[in-house]
From Swiss-Prot:
The keyword Cell inner membrane does not apply. The keyword Nucleus does not apply. Belongs to the rotavirus A NSP6 family. Its main location: host cell. The lineage of its organism: Viruses, Riboviria, Orthornavirae, Duplornaviricota, Resentoviricetes. Keywords: Host cytoplasm, Host mitochondrion. It is found in: Host cytoplasm; Host mitochondrion. It comes from Rotavirus A (strain RVA/Human/United States/Wa/1974/G1P1A[8]) (RV-A). This is Non-structural protein 6. Signal peptide: none annotated. Pfam families: Rota_NS6.
């Protein structure tokens, strides 16, 4: 398997895993969602330092994952203040 295909599979698996995790969380557990998101982001940052460049995500991809998570939080939480607080909490 060539390096480009390896990277594509890695990114797809990462996005699928993130997406399925967020869909399993109920709209009432916003704090759980934020903690899980923070763990994912911490893990991604760790991957930036220990894996070869083929597996590294660029800053734009990390930001896109944050935005997807923020959109999920917004869609599943009807308390605007809690949503804004969560978005501030996970944003760099």
């Amino acid at each position: 398997m060539n390096r480009l295909l390896q990277r594509q599979l890695f990114l797809e698996n990462l996005l699928v895993g993130t997406n399925s995790m967020f869909h399993q969380i109920s709209k009432h557990s916003i704090n759980t969602c934020c903690r899980s998101l923070q763990r994912i982001l911490d893990h991604l940052i760790l991957l930036q330092t220990i894996h070869s460049p083929v597996f590294r995500l660029d800053r734009m991809q990390l930001r896109q994952m944050q935005m997807l998570a923020c959109l999920w939080i917004h869609q599943h939480n009807h308390d605007l203040q809690a949503t804004l607080g969560a978005i501030k909490w996970i944003s760099p």
